[in-house]
Structures are given as structure tokens and as C-alpha cells.
């Protein structure tokens, strides 16, 4: 009897439903880091620089680049044969001469500060007043400017280049199929092609490319301050500027006799409108503004906040923004790209320097 009861208890116990097995807890979802969130936000407004700025009307070729580099450094394109593109836009000095305004023909001073040539091809227009659409058109200006390189005419420039025997073959290779490739337009196209690869990737580009350690926490704090203060309302795009015009003195008037874009359009609305400069390499490209009137970066940051945004920044905010801006300092990927080339020798008919 006892054995039967035990067997009954065993069988009935086995017939009870088993305890349900609880599913395994899903692994915790990793939350993005603060740096990753910052990368996501910043890259949407200020993406990394591309390797070049193409122009469908002027395809970049090795032959154009080689020729353009030579022309960029050739002082024979100036009246006194002392000045070249590189005289004011020095490639071994972040593309500037660090002067308020540049020294041109016969020691004359230009009316505006010479902006850096680096990354300029990404800008929507050229010059402070936007009078040139692209770097090809821009390259035509200084050569004929009486205050700058002072050549008397396009024809005179072409004649100089044609008088240098070594250029004939270089132009033929750069512009194949053209019966007369040495033209003023082609001189500008070659220089423009060379400039379209004058790009300076920096630590910031590594950061928005996904490297959270590329810039320090202090510099990331500066980026946040840059965003919160409103600097990005004008300094936008991969070049942190160069994409729009803005009035100098939006909130607080700025004293200047230069009317900016008004000189080009004669439109009253364009008075005091200037192209917003790029902040790439800004640590190295002072003095600042169209007239080079501001000597140092912290002062420039503070003044822009006051006059453009109506904000009085604390010293800490200025320091934070300055720290971030230094992450935009870069250099060409290939230093050989900016090295001065050996120029073709003058011919028997090449004009002599004219100091007048």
C-alpha cells in the first residue's frame, strides 16, 4: 500500500507543468558617446574636406597641374618680374603673406587683405567682394591689376609666355587639340587646375570621419561653444565659410570706408557686404578682415561675436572657440605638390623687367 502511494505521488508529480523558462535578457544597447553624438551633428553642417574641387568646364589633368604650378611661381607674369601668385599667396605659409594688405608693383599696397589660396576653390565666389565666380576667373585679376602685378594687357601676358620656349610644349600637352593653346584663358585655366588641389585636411576632418580621439575634449568643448554661440550661421560648409555674403556689422556697426560688394553691384543692399571668409587655417592666416585690421585670433573671435551676433563672450568662451579653430589647421597631403618647380628659361625675345 505504501509503495502504491509513493508511485502515485511520483507519477502525479511528473505530470505537473514545468516552470516556464525565462528568455535570456537582451544585451544592453551601447549608447553613443558624447564625441560620437558631436561627430554626427558637426558632420552634417561642416563635412570633411574632399581631395579636390572639380570644375566640369576645366577638368583637372596632370599636365594642367604641372603647367599651372609653374605659372603660379613665375614672376615673369608681372611687369617688374618680381611678383608671382606666390608672392602674396605663399604656399609654404598657409597661402598668405601675413600682411594687412599685400605689397605690389613699385611697393604699392593693395586695398584689401590677401586671403589664403588653400581650399579657396571650394568657395562659391572669389575675392572679398565676390567679383570672380571661380579660381580660374580669379587668376586673371591680379596679373592685370596696376597695384598688384601690373601687366598692361592680356596680350602682353600672352606674348611673354610665348617668348619662353619651354612653355610651348607644356601648353600643347595641357590643352591638346588646340591650334593656339597659349591664351590668357588657358593661363588662368592651368593655374585654376593647380589650385583646385590646394587642399589642407586637418585633425577636424579625421574627427568627423569617425576618429573620436582626433581632437581633445577641450577642443570638442570649443566646437560645442562655436555651435552654441552661433558662429556657424555664417561660417558653414566644409570650409567653414566662403559660401555666402554677410554684412559687416549686422548688430553693432563696424567703421570702414570699404563698401564691399556694393563696389561691384552698385546695389544699396550690398553696402558693407563681404564674402564670409573661411576659417580653415585661421590660426595661421592673420591679420584678419578685409583690411587686415585685426591682429590676433582671440580679438577677432570676440569682435565678431559682438558685431555680428550681439554677444559678449566670456574669456573662457573665447579660449574654447580658439582651441577648436586650431583643429582646422592642416597641410597638403603631399608637400611636393607645393614645391617651387624649375621654370623654363627665358628666350631671346622675352621682355626684360619693367620697373616703371
Each model region followed by its residue ranges:
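Bacterial N-terminal signal peptides
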Residues: 2-12
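Periplasmic c-type cytochrome electron-transfer domains
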Residues: 14-356
Amino acid at each position: 500500500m505504501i509503495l502504491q502511494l509513493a508511485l502515485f505521488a511520483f507519477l502525479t508529480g511528473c505530470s505537473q507543468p514545468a516552470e516556464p523558462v525565462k528568455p535570456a535578457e537582451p544585451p544592453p544597447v551601447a549608447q553613443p558617446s558624447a564625441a560620437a553624438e558631436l561627430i554626427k551633428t558637426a558632420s552634417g553642417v561642416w563635412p570633411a574636406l574632399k581631395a579636390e574641387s572639380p570644375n566640369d568646364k576645366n577638368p583637372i589633368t596632370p599636365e594642367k597641374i604641372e603647367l599651372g604650378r609653374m605659372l603660379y611661381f613665375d614672376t615673369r607674369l608681372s611687369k617688374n618680374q618680381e611678383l608671382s601668385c606666390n608672392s602674396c599667396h605663399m604656399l609654404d605659409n598657409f597661402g598668405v603673406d601675413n600682411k594687412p594688405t599685400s605689397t605690389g608693383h613699385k611697393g604699392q599696397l593693395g586695398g584689401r587683405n590677401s586671403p589664403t589660396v588653400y581650399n579657396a576653390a571650394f568657395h562659391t565666389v572669389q575675392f572679398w567682394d565676390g567679383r570672380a565666380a571661380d579660381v580660374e576667373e580669379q587668376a586673371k585679376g591680379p596679373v592685370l591689376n596696376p597695384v598688384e602685378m601690373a601687366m598692361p594687357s592680356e596680350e602682353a601676358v600672352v606674348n611673354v609666355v610665348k617668348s619662353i620656349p619651354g612653355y610651348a610644349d607644356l601648353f600643347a600637352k595641357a590643352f591638346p587639340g588646340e591650334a593656339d593653346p597659349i591664351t590668357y584663358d588657358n593661363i588662368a585655366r592651368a593655374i585654376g587646375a593647380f589650385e583646385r588641389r590646394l587642399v589642407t585636411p586637418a585633425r577636424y576632418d579625421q574627427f568627423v570621419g569617425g576618429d573620436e580621439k582626433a581632437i581633445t575634449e577641450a577642443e570638442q568643448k570649443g566646437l560645442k561653444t562655436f555651435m552654441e554661440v552661433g558662429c556657424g550661421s555664417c561660417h558653414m560648409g566644409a570650409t567653414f565659410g566662403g559660401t555666402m555674403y554677410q554684412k559687416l556689422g549686422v548688430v553693432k556697426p563696424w567703421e570702414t570706408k570699404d563698401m564691399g560688394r556694393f563696389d561691384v553691384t552698385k546695389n544699396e543692399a550690398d553696402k558693407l557686404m563681404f564674402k564670409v571668409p573661411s576659417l580653415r587655417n585661421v590660426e595661421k592666416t592673420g591679420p584678419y578682415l578685409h583690411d587686415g585690421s585685426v591682429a590676433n585670433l582671440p580679438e577677432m573671435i570676440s569682435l565678431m561675436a559682438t558685431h555680428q551676433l550681439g554677444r559678449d563672450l566670456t574669456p573662457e568662451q573665447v579660449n574654447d572657440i580658439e582651441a577648436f579653430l586650431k583643429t582646422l589647421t592642416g597641410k597638403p597631403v603631399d608637400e611636393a605638390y607645393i614645391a617651387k618647380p624649375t621654370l623654363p628659361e627665358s628666350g631671346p625675345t622675352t621682355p626684360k623687367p619693367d620697373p616703371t
